[in-house]
Every structure is written in structure tokens, then in C-alpha cells.
Amino acid sequence: MATEQTAITRATFDEVILPVYAPADFIPVKGKGSRVWDQQGKEYIDFAGGIAVTALGHCHPALVEALKSQGETLWHTSNVFTNEPALCLGRKLIDATFAERVLFMNSGTEANETAFKLARHYACVRHSPFKTKIIAFQNAFHGRSLFTVSVGGQPKYSDGFGPKPADIIHVPFNDLHAVKAVMDDHTCAVVVEPIQGEGGVQAATPEFLKGLRDLCDKHQALLVFDEVQCGMGRTGDLFAYMHYGVTPDILTSAKALGGGFPVSAMLTTQEIASAFHVGSHGSTYGGNPLACAVAGAAFDIINTPEVLQGIHTKRQQFVQHLQAIDEQFDIFSDIRGMGLLIGAELKPKYKGRARDFLYAGAEAGVMVLNAGADVMRFAPSLVVEEADINEGMQRFAQAVGKVVA
């Protein structure tokens, strides 16, 4: 909120925040559903969703009520004590998935850090202290801590911070032969996003994930699914593993889990969880009542046939608009993804210009994302209305027209 002494503008960002982001020139101040307004009152249609976070749009009444109600009851206890919202949310996740145990954290990075530590510790105590190899994939993204950014397969994020955690191997995504070539009995885990979000909205093939499951079983390694971006209804199933019919040993969830309130979770089986003991891992804020109350309300809405089945129809509407834009301007070489995580790859003549289309979209009143320099990404609310899709994509078409003119 602006103070009486100093007005808050985009320039304020450059004066007070570390230069690790390059935010848009406008500052959003209000949101409702799939609409956002900036300081000047300009309206935007939001197809970015806070990077696949605001799964029920902005200020959904059920989430607002959950936050208000819990905010008047209990905010924080730490994990010296437990709390009802965390236990209720944990039960909901376990009842709806393969998991038997859950640990709450605050971000996707923390959930993945937990998963990777557990995978290595489980291998150490159940098998051998030398079973430490983690196999991950090129162009993957698993977070920003030193461990998670090292497991992620993008040197632009991991280089320049000194020695990295050892025994992490990266191979091409969707290449089962490459995995077989490096996998052995020293492998503790294979870590994969069923859909690489930051890596260009690339979906794994069913054969690839099933092959990973078989290899993990053969070598007594754990299969870890990072569903931070593609989980919680984004694909049209509650979690992407359900679409593929491949069950992981560990699954991580964040982003849409809280509908905009920071919360994450690592899900696993009782057997694997038992490798941890009191003090093995933890978080001061993880599983706090405010976050879990909001996440519980979001879960109750997302995990319904009405919402999950509607995602497929909404996806088709987006794809039809993108196909029409491509017919008019000839800019996309591929339209891909799953559910409401959609990628549109730019043709070679527009290579490297995804940010140009993003900025033009904002100017036209629509918020979109890029996934690398060559892919436009759409991750709207799972309950975005048809009218918002139509109007927002019309605005995006206008933006495309200006860029290619």
C-alpha cells in the first residue's frame, strides 16, 4: 500500500527489491475471478494465473471465507504443536491419492527439497550409503535452493554458485534409452515432471513414464514426480500421474494447492516416510493453519467432477483460439500441453521473441506467460469462464498482430 509520503510505482521496485525479477511495467492491485486491475484502473484478463497458482481465480469467495474464518481463530503454532486444518488437509490428500503420509511445506522448492532428501535418506538407511545417484532431466525445473536447482536441468539457473551437490545426472527428457544407459543399483531416485512447465510445456509420453517406473522397480530406486506446476487439477485429473496410470513413490505439490496462498506438500507411502524420524526434516511455517485452511477449501472445489471435467472443454476453447491465431498470422509450430497447461511454440522466424508477445499481451489487456524464449504458456484459472476465454484470446490475437506487423 502506498504511504502518504511516497507513492508506490514500478520504479519503486528497482529501488528496493533485489534485481532477480523483471516485472511488467504495471502493478496489479485488485483481482476478481479471471480479471485483474492495475493502479490506473486498467483491466486485464489473467491467463497466467500467477504461474499456475490461482487455480480458482482471484479472491474466490470460498477461499476468502476460509482465510477470514481461520484468521479470526488461529494463525500459527509451529510444528511443536499440530493443528486441525493441517490434519484435515492431510487426510483429504491421502484419501484422494496413492499416498499414506504427507509433509507440508511453503513452496515448491521446499517440497522438492524434502523429496530429494527423503529419497537419499531412504536409500541410505534401507539399502546402502553409496546409493546416492539422482537421475533428472535436461530443461527440468525443480526450484531455486542449491539442491533443487542442481537437480533441475538448466545450467543458466544453477551455474555460478560454487560447488553443486554431487551425484546428479541429467539426461534428455522422454529418452528412456538415455536413462537406461546411466541407471544402476547406485541410483536412489529418478526425478521427473510429468509435464515440464518451465522447460517449454513438454509432456512426458506414457511409455516414458511407465519405463521409468519399471527401471526404478528393477534397481530399487524411488520414482519422484514433481507435480508442482502440473498437479492439482491442471491436467483435468487431480494429479497428472492419474492420467498416465503410473504411480510414483513420492509426489510434490504446491502452486495451485493453496489457490494463491503459499503452501506445498510432499506425498509418499508409509514405508518410505518411515525412513525419516523426529528431526530429520522440518519447517517452522510448514502446515500452518492459515495456509492449510485455504488449501482445504481449494481442494474441496478442485477435486470435483464439475471442475475436473470442465477443464477439457476449456482447453479445447483455448486450442481453437490458438489455431485461429496461427491460421491468421502463421506464428506457431506446435500447440501442446495437457488440460489448462498449454504451450504454443513459436516458429523459427519468431525464435527468441516470446517475451515480446507477453509484453504486447499486457498492453492489450491480457496476462500470459512464456516458457523459455520460444514458447508462449497459458495457465489460467481452472474455472475460467467461456466469455473470459473468448475475450482474452481476442486481446491476445490483437497483441500478436501488433508484434508481427
Curated annotation (Swiss-Prot):
Catalysis: reaction(s): N(2)-acetyl-L-ornithine + 2-oxoglutarate = N-acetyl-L-glutamate 5-semialdehyde + L-glutamate; N-succinyl-(2S,6S)-2,6-diaminopimelate + 2-oxoglutarate = (S)-2-succinylamino-6-oxoheptanedioate + L-glutamate
Species per Swiss-Prot/TrEMBL record: Salmonella typhi
Cofactor note text: Binds 1 pyridoxal phosphate per subunit.
Gene coding for it: argD
Ligand binding (N(2)-acetyl-L-ornithine): R144, S283
Protein's name according to its UniProt entry: Acetylornithine/succinyldiaminopimelate aminotransferase
PANTHER family reported in the protein's UniProt record: ACETYLORNITHINE_SUCCINYLDIAMINOPIMELATE AMINOTRANSFERASE (PTHR11986:SF122), AMINOTRANSFERASE CLASS III (PTHR11986)
CDD domains attached to this UniProt entry: OAT_like
Cofactors demanded by this protein: pyridoxal 5'-phosphate
Molecular function as annotated in GO: identical protein binding; N2-acetyl-L-ornithine:2-oxoglutarate 5-aminotransferase activity; pyridoxal phosphate binding; succinyldiaminopimelate transaminase activity
Single Gene Ontology BP annotation: L-arginine biosynthetic process
Signal peptide limits: none
GO CC annotation: cytoplasm
Quaternary context: Homodimer.
